[in-house]
Amino acid sequence: MRSLFRLYLFIMGAFIILVMTGEPSVLVHATIPEEITPLVKSKEDQKIAYLTFDDGPSTNTMDILDILDRYHVKATFFVKGNEEPYAKQCYKEMISRGHEIALHSYTHDYSIVYRSTESFFQDLNRLETMLEKEYGVKSRIVRIPGGSNNHLRHQVTTRPIINGILQQLSEKGYIYFDWNIDSTDGISPSISEQQIITSVKRGLKDQKHVNILLHDINSMKNTVKALPDIIENLKREGYTFDTIDETTPKIQFK
């Protein structure tokens, strides 16, 4: 019996050694079938809407911010210099709610802003100084009053000034943005809520990136009324929302 037991131990030991010293085991790497690999769209392929509000803060700003909050949408505010007590709170709310503050002008007075290239940058720098000192905001994103192809650019006396402004903006490291959809709300306070909504809808034209011009002005109450419908329609059309920064595809008039 002892001999048989020793033989059994010998055989089992030999088997274990064979297993341990045999061919190395094959490592199997799990792979995700190609058909279920998630597809991630690049930013260029996505439908993105940039809601932009010029000329604020105004007495409408808080209502605009509340609507944006309700729809979980972030926007870009091209602001003026406004040092009224209510405006100071508006700047703070824009920042705390995650919106982008960009540069428009301090005065928005064409007779000052477009008097000369030097006058433009004095006005712009005044706005920059206020925003940085009071709110810690630094921005290199600019929308010049009236846009880069405004009516003054077509006048012989002011065309060189505006061309010089655009050139120096680039040289100084700013990025200027125009728009590719005009809501028409800036034409007059009498522009109706429905006209504003329709102008935005018509402007979409299957564009993937839409930069929508809206205004944040005391008298433009219909912009506030139109905003929920504008957002809802953009969502139905498959747009997501983003704010403008240095990486945003440029939209500039030619």
Q: Could you describe each region identified by the protein language model?
A:
Residues 29-119, 123-138, 233, 240, ...:
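Active-site beta->alpha N-cap acidic-glycine motif
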Residues 108-213, 217-233, 246, 253-254:
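Catalytic domains of cell-wall/extracellular-matrix polysaccharide-remodeling enzymes
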Residues 1-50, 66-75, 133, 180, ...:
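Terminal accessory/targeting
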